[in-house]
Regions:
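Catalytic cores of alpha/beta
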Residues: 11-19, 72-76, 100, 118-128, ...
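Alpha-helix-loop-beta-strand connector modules within alpha/beta enzyme cores
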Residues: 44-61, 81-82, 98-111, 146-167, ...
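Conserved, mostly hydrophobic/aromatic
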Residues: 28, 89, 125, 181, ...
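Active-site beta->alpha loop and helix N-cap motifs at the rims of alpha/beta catalytic domains
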Residues: 3-5, 9-13, 19-21, 27-103, ...
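C-terminal alpha-helical cap/extension of soluble enzyme domains
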Residues: 158-221
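Glycine-enriched alpha-helix->loop->beta-strand junction motifs that scaffold or abut catalytic
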Residues: 20-24, 83-87, 103-112, 127-134, ...
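Catalytic beta/alpha-barrel core
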Residues: 4-6, 62-69, 86-95, 109-124, ...
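Glycine-rich phosphate-binding active-site loops on the catalytic face of alpha/beta enzymes
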Residues: 24, 29-34, 115, 132-143, ...
């Protein structure tokens, strides 16, 4: 399973990319707004930022449209895709989003359909030509449903139906979600910087390393 960072923060991407385990990045309008801390964006400023994200990520970067109607989504998606070969256009899973997905995918532009909360939505997205579908585990858990079960259904359906789509486990809240996604067969898990860091931490690792160093200090030359 590939590991993506869910952020638009260049420093966060730079830090995790240095580990040698990062395969891509996902962004959304909220994350972009957070990265610019209330700055009023121009297209030139946004495009420069997304290009920088692509260079740091070294793999697919999902950039989401802000338009709500299909025709405008397609136009915005084309502009985003033209910025860098790594750009994947992110669309909401709505009627207009499906129309835009079909049009963009027909032009050879990769699409990530987001805000997926049911297996049927994932099926529709795949049939519309999406390259990726992004079920939201954490938000499903928040309403007392089972995000893991949703992911299991989508992965199983993809296999049974032989759908040419990759499944991104999204809305990941904690390391257990990552383990669950890997065990359930997700192709990709995308997570915030804090969760990525938490994957590595374990108190017994710290304790063991400290003990090794203490013992070494007793005998080193």
């Amino acid at each position: 399973m590939e590991l993506y960072l869910d952020t638009a923060d260049l420093e966060e991407i730079r830090e995790i990319a240095a580990w040698g385990v990062l395969s891509g990045v996902t962004t959304n309008p909220t994350l972009v707004a957070k990265a610019f801390a209330g700055e009023r964006l121009t297209w030139e400023r946004l495009s420069q930022h997304l290009k920088a994200v692509c260079e740091l990520a070294g793999g697919p970067v999902s950039a989401e449209v802000t338009a709500l109607e299909a025709e405008a989504m397609v136009e915005e998606g084309r502009r985003l895709a033209a910025l860098h070969p790594n750009i994947v256009v992110k669309l909401p899973t709505t009627e207009e989003g499906l129309k835009a997905c079909r049009a963009l995918s027909a032009e050879g532009i990769r699409v990530n359909m987001t805000l997926i909360f049911s297996a049927n939505q994932a099926l529709l997205a795949a049939r519309a030509g999406a390259s990726y579908v992004s079920p939201f585990l954490g938000r499903v858990d928040d309403i007392s449903w089972d995000g893991g079960e949703l992911l299991r259904e989508i992965v199983e359906m993809r296999e049974v139906q032989d759908l040419p789509v990759r499944v991104i486990a999204a809305s990941i809240r904690h390391p257990r979600h990552v383990t669950e996604a890997a065990l359930l067969g997700a192709d990709i898990a995308t997570m915030p910087h804090a969760v990525f860091k938490a994957l590595l931490r374990h108190p017994l690792t710290d304790l063991g390393l400290r003990r090794f160093m203490e013992d070494w200090e007793k005998v080193r030359p």
